[in-house]
Curated annotation (Swiss-Prot):
Keyword Ribosomal protein carried by entry: yes
Keyword annotations: Ribonucleoprotein, Ribosomal protein
GO BP, sorted A to Z: translation
Classification via NCBIfam families: rpmH_bact
Native source species: Wolbachia sp. subsp. Drosophila simulans (strain wRi)
Family: Belongs to the bacterial ribosomal protein bL34 family.
Cystine crosslinks: none
Name of one Pfam family that matches: Ribosomal_L34
GO molecular function annotations of the record: structural constituent of ribosome
Name assigned to this protein: Large ribosomal subunit protein bL34
Amino acid sequence: MKRTFQPKNLIRKRRHGFRSRMATRAGRKILNRRRSLGCNKLCA
């Protein structure tokens, strides 16, 4: 059976990257929350 995690940087960026977060209202909410928590890394 194939493992579920097959790492690919492009897919990682497209799904969880900064621009995909900024594209939706919910994504911007995530970024604001992570900023308020003081996360150094906001996205993938």
